[in-house]
Amino acid sequence: SSHRLPSVQVETLSERFTEQLDKTAQKLTDVKGSLDYFRAVSAYANHLNKEDMRFRNLMFNGDILIPKEKIAEIYYGFNENYNLRNRLESTKEELMKILNRKIHVEMRKKWVEDAVQNLSKEEIQQFHAEGEEEILNADKEFISRNHWLSINNQFVHMLKEMPKILNLADFGISNELWAEEIKATVGRLKKGRLSLADASSYIYLYDLMTGKRGDKDIRYLFIDEVQDYSAFQLAFLKFSFPRAQFTLLGDLNQAIFTHENSRKLLGELGSDSIQS
């Protein structure tokens, strides 16, 4: 997942296995690895079509060029039938138009006059051309790479909303314990880190926010040691490769999700070969 999340370092498997999980930590890992949690993340993302998407200001020279409130206004100003993918693409187009207009205005400001006062006419023309290009390239990349979305803030907001979507008591988790876990997650994110238990839901949420539909060209997927995967991870793989026929190998008696859930989930995955 590291290439998918360049700004976040995910806990490795070896780090995970050296941790001795107490019963409380195990409960948190169990809920985050469940099929119910996968559905809860999906439901949360669906809600983002109407409200609560988190945005970041588009900056230039330390100043706000396009405020996040304006981005929110654009994003939620489209037809209510738009899905997250439509909203993302249409907002990008609108931001590019605004950016082009604002840069032309910016290049006529006093700081530009001061910078070019001792230059020749040709040098001034070159300064304007290169200056606009340089600004546009940086901000266009900010827009095209979806950096105006705030995945960390969004992920934390999702965790805070989770008790409204999912009955955590079913997993033996109190609201107080969940609040403590959110605090720990925020602490990790501030250090640029993410627990292995959070990695799948973080990537899945980002994929939903950015309208990814999965790789439809992959037709066959072989997964060994399937008992080491959580139900969430398998459901996420199904989302990521929607047309793939799954062949799962491993010992289902040792699966980290329940036997009943595993059979149901494997059935949904359309697995043609399950060895247990």
What are these regions (language model features)?
Residues 2-11, 207-220, 227-276:
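Conserved helicase motor core of SF1/SF2 NTP-dependent helicases
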Residues 2-46, 50:
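P-loop NTPase motor core
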Residues 9, 18, 31-34, 83, ...:
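Alpha-helix initiation/capping motif
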Residues 22, 26, 100-104, 241, ...:
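Hydrophobic/aromatic-lined pockets within catalytic cores
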Residues 27-30, 34, 54, 101-108, ...:
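Intrinsically disordered or highly flexible coil/loop and linker segments, enriched in small
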Residues 29-39, 178-183, 206-209, 232-243:
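Charged, low-complexity, helix/coiled-coil-prone segments
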Residues 38-47, 182-188, 242-251:
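Short charge-dense sequence patches
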Residues 44, 48-220, 233-234:
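Conserved helicase NTPase catalytic core signature
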